[in-house]
């Protein structure tokens, strides 16, 4: 799998959302993945923005439409529209601020309340380059991820550590779910989903196929 540059040429379009407390680095994760850019002066996101990037998974081109919003309470009114149609999510906390991990449970509940049970969720511990300031152990989060059946990875948007891996893993897992559902339905996965259609991962009875905890910490 790898990067694919022609943005108008793709087989699948997946909506992925970033969620978590304000200031954990969601916007910089997005800009690092989509533009290979990092801003030291990144202010809290106002409202909602999204960016896109296409990658190759197997022999298919997967286009990600990645949405980013501020984690501040005053923006919670946009929740329903923000999550609608999402088939993947990166739930981000800051490894140097324990309160951001404490709030993960609330963000996870909100995410699950507004998305399908098959939505691929990656728990992301950002700012892993600041290991000397670490406030949350990798093991603590790994245990939580196993309990909640989510994926888990630690990243550094600043140093571009695991950012590519985190997004690519989420997109690959979504693709696997969609392909499996098409095959289970007796369809050819290459023709079951028209090009350009926003993908919905569907029913709630197939959760075990997706939610296998994994940890790729730095």
Curated annotation (Swiss-Prot):
Gene3D superfamilies listed in its UniProt record: P-loop containing nucleotide triphosphate hydrolases
Annotated motif Effector region, positions: 42-50
Entry's Gene Ontology BP terms: protein transport
Keywords: Cell membrane, GTP-binding, Lipoprotein, Membrane, Nucleotide-binding, Prenylation, Protein transport, Transport
Membrane topology according to the record: Lipid-anchor
Chain positions recorded as GTP binding sites: 20-27, 68-72, 126-129, 156-157
UniProt GO molecular function: GTP binding; GTPase activity
Compartments in which it is found: Cell membrane
Pfam families for the chain: Ras (PF00071)
A single Gene Ontology CC term: plasma membrane
Homology family: Belongs to the small GTPase superfamily. Rab family.
Protein name in the entry: Ras-related protein RABA1h
Encoding gene (name): RABA1H
